[in-house]
Amino acid sequence: MIVKTRAIVLREIRYRDQSKICSLFTREFGLLSVIIKGGRNPKSKLAGRFIAGTVLDIVLYKKTTREIQLVSEGNLLFSPMVPQPDIERYAIMYRIIDLVSQSIDGQEKNIPLFSLIASVLEELYSTSDRFRLLYSWFLLKLVSLLGFEPSIHRCVLSHEEISPATLAENKGELCFLFNPGGVALPASKSVIENENRPLSMATYALLSAISSTPLNLLKNIEAIPPQTDLLCNLLEEYCTLHLVHHPHKKNIAIVSQILSE
């Protein structure tokens, strides 16, 4: 059966002399393994298109009895091979697709997750800076989509609204709890008993801002790098904690090291 779908390349490996096998996250079929015949031949029409992080519209011959599907066409939409390469952009891109690989459950399709990944990658490849702010936004949306949305505007323990008056009463001191997930006022003893991280007012303000800002308006958020880094590290720790599968911990450590340099 010949089918069309949009796909994100998660991984590629060499196969024989000139071909490659890729792991794709597709809009209609979820996770697929495909073969790109001649994909490493410079003369092939598919050469250079199926690399990690690219988003394409593809045509493939799909058989339910076959584990690896055959791709016949690939129209490139977004690619990390932008005119001005940046090592931090690549590090963020690899971290995103690594988290996606952990989040996908078999071949089950997940259109909301696919749409999130595709839109974030498109934005990542079109911007020239503030990659960590975009990554923080992605982490928050991803963990929320997976069913672990943290409570941000109400205390996760008391359910009290976190208002300016409440913050003043608590001298601006907040905590972020991993379980249950969300922001907490420090008045409760439970905060001490649960795993938590201190949350400054500046970091909380940034968290609150990105939680209510659509992707196309993210550029309007004012954030200094130190606060973005703190929030990014916090959300990555929270997100990783709640992912069920952890097959690529070595990759996570490598990318985290790149981002910290």
From Swiss-Prot:
An example Gene Ontology CC term for this record: bacterial nucleoid
In terms of superkingdom, the source organism counts as Bacteria
**Any one GO BP annotation for this protein:** double-strand break repair
What are the entry keywords?
DNA damage, DNA recombination, DNA repair
Q: Which InterPro entries match?
A: ARFGAP/RecO, DNA_rep/recomb_RecO_N, NA-bd_OB-fold, RecO, RecO_C
Listed as disulfide-bonded, the cysteine pairs are none
Pfam entry (one): RecO_N
Indicate the transmembrane segments per the record: none
Query: Which family is this protein grouped under?
Result: Belongs to the RecO family.
Function noted in UniProt = Involved in DNA repair and RecF pathway recombination.
What protein name applies here? DNA repair protein RecO
Instruction: Provide the organism lineage as a comma list.
Output: Bacteria, Pseudomonadati, Chlorobiota, Chlorobiia, Chlorobiales
